[in-house]
Amino acid sequence: KAIRRQRQMCIRDRKWNNGWINVVNPFRASIVLGTPGSGKSFAVVNSYIKQQIEKGYAAYIYDFKFPDLSTIAYNHLLNHLEGYKVPPKFYVINFDDPSRSHRCNPLNPKFMTDISDAYESSYSIMLNLNRSWAAKQGDFFVESPTILFAAIIWFLRVYKDGRYCTFPHAVEFLNKPYEQIFPIMSSYPELENYLSPFLDAWLAGAADQLMGQIASAKIPLSRMISPALYWVMSADEFSLDINNPDEPKILCIGNNPDRQAIYGAALGLYNSRIVKIVNKKGRLKSSIIIDELPTIFIKGLDNLIATARSNKVAVLLGFQDFSQLIRDYTDKEAKVIINTVGNIFSGQVVGETAKTLSERFGKILQKRHSISINRQDVSTSISTQMDSLIPPSKISGLTQGMFVGSVADNFGERIEQKIFHCEIVVDAGKIAEEEKAYQKIPVITGFVDDDGVDHMKEMVQENYNRIKEDVKRIVADELERIASDPALKHLLELNK
């Protein structure tokens, strides 16, 4: 079914006409552009969330200014469960307040079927911690920490069938002395090739090079050592397969603009895992709504847009300007994203973005009248010329709530007027009434005992300490195993 938005549009005889913007195929992906204050979220993103819940979509929502979008999704779901055959469950990831957050392990071993999954997870984490690395793929000091952390993730996946395969355990294991972690990991045949560059440097006595490789992974990841973050990412209260027909989910993941540097990598890991898990056949229709896209890096986003249509995944990306996308996703990947999206909404944008959009909307044959006056007479000439349908100057001067854009159609659902220049009309009074009845996202984990004492801080700290003890025990047990195995004990002699 189409996602609909009321509009007013000047299309004939210089008159405004009431009508609708019909997104008949949201699975061809959508982009919402506009400078801050242009009305992206209020006019478009919020409508997407509400209408897709009404139409029975499973959903993943990245909420940069948590809990703005999450509150809308939570309350709209409460009032529109009738759109689903199996009622979905509502889940929240929130690092700021563990009591209002579910716990989810993005490195769940059930979804880590190959070492390439470990590499993709590591890659996503590293690029969210070091955004400039996106343009340096293949460089020595980009690949080294990525491969090292991927090897650690896969070691934890194969160790005791993934019992300790979590992001916090991986960070703690990385921070153990390399004289301990390299013998342990190299005792596993599936990791030998991954670790060979590090082992070669170790055996050659290139300690400075080795320490540099390890430090390039340790230093950025040290920013993420947080008891609250460890709490949320170290247990499995739900899985990330949001479009599972038997267990549909509405998942909201919240960021905090003040802690973006810390939370960005963890959230990027969730995003990358979700993008891969949901893009499969035989699942429920689902939506991935990411407002303020440049605040995170999502590996595989271009591939998702290109392939999601056949798997019924509707992608909506919100950001301010194409230059943001080019800066954070490299020029090549940004162009793929821009050119493969079927539906586009744009509020006020300027510069190259306005020019690009104007070119996308095309040109139209327009009549021009010219009048020439001289002493004897007045002559009038009429000519035709191809001019921009919506010139860049008009896009640069759009007022708040005014949008230009285009929509894609389907076989059997033809749209003659694909391009629009309109005011998206939002019933502000109705929305205000809805918001008065909104409920807050409830407390999910109760840390308060019967006497009213809040134990959140100590329970979160206990979990943090337990993870550190888990890793100490893993290292001790593995070193003991290697020392007692005649075929492996030579690995410990490499330290001498």
Model-derived regions: residue spans:
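Single conserved hydrophobic/aromatic residue that forms the stacking wall/gate
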Residues: 1-7, 11
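Conserved ATP-driven motor cores of ASCE-family P-loop NTPases powering translocation/secretion/packaging/pilus
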Residues: 305-307, 311-408
